[in-house]
Regions:
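N-terminal and secondary-structure boundary signal
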Residues: 1-277
């Protein structure tokens, strides 16, 4: 037995506890680090483990749309997104999902998803990663549930959706025009997304949002395999984080980053492409 093995019945029972705790008929978005949770199969094999997790998710979240990240960050350099051939770059589960279910993949560059049990998500490309028509906008409008399996709030991309809607001072919009390829059909896209300044010391995140969400009982923890899962309803997450940003526009940053960002914005108003690149 390998050290990553976790009993699949145990894992299913733990995931069912999560399922019981969330409202009916809403989608789930699962950000995960499967290596931390464990492999519910005897073999240490990415494809076998991918299939095992796919079956677990389908068995547990039977009536829900299951939104799984398949992000391809290299689009920012290549400016080409091949929906069927560009594998996910956020762990082996993202690669497995594209290999098996590319027809279920959303068509927006960078922040794209495979959606199992897709009831009514529209997969067409969005011009803005977190804007109108994006998977994030659709997910939040459906009051979906965020599931962080073995990862923390800093790996939670819905955080960026709230920041985009709040027009935070420490991010700015940048265009990445390029090409989407699907079934040999090429589609030009004027794609944009919010980015941070190139200097990582200026915008460095603390863990305060996760701490505050847990203290407010908006986020809840569940044991899962060798790790734990944090869950949060997206509408509560949105309201809480938005309010914190209203009270303190640099709320999620470290103290040093807050001081640097505040000094920059007092002088320049906000971060922008012209000032930062």
């Amino acid at each position: 037995m390998h050290k990553f093995y976790v009993n699949p019945n145990q894992l299913k029972a733990e995931l069912l506890e999560i399922e019981k705790s969330i409202p009916p008929n809403v989608p789930v978005m699962i950000h995960s680090d499967i290596m931390k949770a464990g492999f519910p199969c005897i073999e240490v094999d990415a494809n076998i483990a991918g299939l095992a997790y796919e079956n677990l998710f389908l068995d547990v979240f039977t009536e829900r749309s299951i939104v799984l990240p398949t992000f391809n960050y290299d689009y920012c350099q290549s400016r080409v997104f091949n929906v069927k051939k560009d594998l996910g770059q956020v762990g082996f589960l993202s690669r497995y999902m594209v290999k098996k279910h590319s027809e279920l993949r959303s068509k927006t560059p960078v922040f794209n998803f495979v959606i199992l049990n897709n009831h009514d998500f529209i997969l067409e490309p969005s011009q803005d990663a977190f804007g109108k028509g994006s998977i994030y906008e659709q997910f939040f409008s459906k009051k979906g549930v965020i599931i962080l399996l073995g990862v923390g709030i800093l790996q939670c991309t819905p955080l960026m959706y709230v920041e985009a809607q709040s027009n935070v001072l420490y991010r700015y919009s940048k265009k990445f025009p390029g090409m989407i390829i699907e079934n040999d059909k090429e589609i030009y896209v004027e794609f944009s997304m919010p980015v941070r300044p190139l200097n990582p010391d200026v915008v460095e995140y603390s863990n305060i949002l996760e701490i505050d969400l847990l203290n407010a009982n908006i986020m809840k923890k569940f044991p899962t395999g060798f790790t734990e899962t944090i869950i949060c309803q997206s509408d509560e997450f949105f309201d809480f984080f938005s309010q914190k940003l209203t009270e303190d526009p640099f709320y999620p940053l470290t103290d040093n980053a807050k001081a640097a960002a505040n000094q920059f914005c007092q002088k320049n108003g906000r971060f922008s492409l012209e000032l930062c690149e």
